[in-house]
Structures are given as C-alpha cells and as structure tokens.
C-alpha cells in the first residue's frame, strides 16, 4: 500500500455524532494526540484554538455539583486538570498549536507565549506582511507544552477570493510563522 505522507483528522459531523458535541474534553483530545503519535505521526497540528480552560475538568466538577460529599470533592480536586492531561500528551509528541490574528487587540490572561525564532535580514519586512493588531492564542499550559505555534489566519482579496497564503505574518507587531510553515520547522 502506498504511504500517505499527510493525513487530515477532521472533526466532522460523523465524529460529532459518534463522540458528542464540540468542544470535546481535553482528555479526549489528549487521547487523539497519543494515538496519532503511536501510529507514527511525525507532527500534529491543530487549526483550532484552546483559548479557555476546559469546562469539564475535575476541579470544576467539584465546585459545580453541589450534592457531592466533601470526600468526593477532595478526590476530584486532587486529579490533574484536563488541560494538564492534554499538555502532558503534547509534550510527548511534536504538536503545533494554531493561533489566529485578530483585527483588534484582545486582552488575554497568562504569560506571554514563548518566543518565535524568526530572524529578518536586510530591510524591515513588516510593512509587506499581512498584519493583525490582535492575536488569539491558546491557554498558557498548552502553549508552553507545544513544540511550536503558527497562525492559520488568511485574508481574501477585495473580490472575496483567497489567492495567497503567506508563510509568515505579523501579529501584535511580531513576525509569526503560518501553521504549515511552523509544522515544517518542527518536523525537521
């Protein structure tokens, strides 16, 4: 059988019918990462953003379900968050997380994302790049675990047609790689 160098795992209607509505618990996403890695994936990328903590983490259940006894609450609080479980899976694989440029600056909690390793030689390229004043990124526990981060923002021309997908863009005055460009960096 011929090898397939690229496989796209699509969260489609059939997946949603079988596994439930999106967003899935981060533990399920962690299982996907682990399974893909076990199957030989050399790089895994997400073109979705995990911008908020998982609403299904055990510690949140301990607070939300009022009828739980204190012993059960304490057991739930002692479990790792679903985000930590996913971060652990990310660390065991080569995962590139997606980010998206925004037309406005949106305040986000947490530390700044890890530095991007892009150097520019010669004149300043910033005036020639697609530019986004804002950036929507993943929560820090996931960001810090990832092998890379890349933008999956695209812009159409005035007629609504997308003719170019740049390899680098500008977001919050920082040169950032596209998702696919960052995947190439991480895999090599």
Spans of features found by a protein language model:
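Non-transmembrane functional regions of envelope-associated proteins
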Residues: 1-188
């Amino acid at each position: 059988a011929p090898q397939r160098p690229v496989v796209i795992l699509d969260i489609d209607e059939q997946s949603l019918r079988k596994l439930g509505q999106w967003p899935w618990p981060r533990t399920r996403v962690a299982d996907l990462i682990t399974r893909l890695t076990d199957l030989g994936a050399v790089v895994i990328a997400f073109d979705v953003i995990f911008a908020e903590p998982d609403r299904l983490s055990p510690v949140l259940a301990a607070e939300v379900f009022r009828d739980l006894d204190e012993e059960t609450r304490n057991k739930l609080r002692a479990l790792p968050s679903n985000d930590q479980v996913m971060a652990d899976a990310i660390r065991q694989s080569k995962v590139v997380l997606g980010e998206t440029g925004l037309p406005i600056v949106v305040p986000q909690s947490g530390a700044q994302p890890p530095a991007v390793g892009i150097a520019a030689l010669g004149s300043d390229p910033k005036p020639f790049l697609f530019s986004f004043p804002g950036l929507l990124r993943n929560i820090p526990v996931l960001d810090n675990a990832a092998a890379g981060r890349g933008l999956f923002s695209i812009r159409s021309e005035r007629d609504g047609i997308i003719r170019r997908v740049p390899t680098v863009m500008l977001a919050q005055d920082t040169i950032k790689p596209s998702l696919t460009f960052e995947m190439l960096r991480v895999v090599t």
